[in-house]
Amino acid sequence: MKKKIKILPLVFLLFLFTHFVSAGISFGKNVAVEYIGGNNKGNIVNSLKYEIKQILTKQEDVNLYEAHKESYITINGLVQKIFGNKIINDAEVSNDVVKLKNGQLTGYTHSLFTEEKLKKYSKDIDEFSKYLNNNETGFIYVQIPSKTSGDSQQLPAIITDYTDRSFNQIISVFKEKNVNVLDLRSKIKEQKIDIYSLFYKTDHHWNSFAGRWAANEIGAVMNSDYGFTLDLSRLDQENFYLNKNPKKFLGSWGKRVGPLYAGVDDFDILIPKYETSFVYKYNDITRTGSFEEALIDYSFFSGNYYHRFTYCTFLSGNFAFINIHNNNFSCDKSVLCIVNSYSCALLPYMALSGYKDIYAIDPRVNSFSAKYYVDKYKPDVVIYMMNTDYDSVTLIK
């Protein structure tokens, strides 16, 4: 503890020194620009007055902050780590970053769904379920777990998290309407899986290992409850090799506190050993080839930690609509998935198990209704799998 106390003033002084040096360099540069080619060209006194006025009106401070924002975040994260702070507050409370006892970062849910919202969800689901039933289309809700679906004792004692209770509210709505439910949280507990091994340390998303595991669980229900003939042996662990990419990923929570607060993540990807062939339609782009060629996009490894969106390596990231066609399909059936960004690490592995076509929409960026895509593509089953963003979903309109 004494060492921490001695180090803290040095860190703070380093922060101030860096700030003032940056400010001085920026001020001198801007005075020179104003003197050489600005409105006060050739007049050093007026150039100085102009730049001082800019500082006093805060415009210069804004520019300086934007220019060095990443450095400030990194230094602040280091200071927070040294102080041992487990909760990093944001101006927007939903963006607060929490460090669990195991060192992983997370957010948390601040409240339950209101009765008004639940009634709306219930009405929409009831109408959509009846529409699918009339069209002889299967319907299932898959509850995607959250990192806080694990041990609640991992959270700081001051935090009250409503994540699992809000999931239970949603599940109750689906069950009341006689919609089949696959709760992956229960499967994790039944199989005694370490839930934190399924997630990145600095991000809310789950990883490649979770994607393969969840694809197998979903496929088993497709076979048992909907008459699919998926070859789930394709998802056996021994049929993959691990493409290791150490320290490639600073997740969304990590970007709010910097890489020194909780470290950075490896971004390891499970790649099938067997031959694969896909046609992947992503928004207006089409890619063809093997699993790795069509569904994995390594261009997102470029840039520094703050500018690198590594999670988008799966499927090239968020989409309005995608279609994954498996040229080596083992099951002549298709599904329409209503998803959010968690699907990026899941759908590539679902595709491996042999669906002829997987169609997916992300309602956060797609204004068309699910009904529109059901009418257009005639899927055998609609899979509604979310853990947030329920308000963005339009089922029928």
What are these regions (language model features)?
Residues 1-397:
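Extracellular glycan-modifying ectodomains
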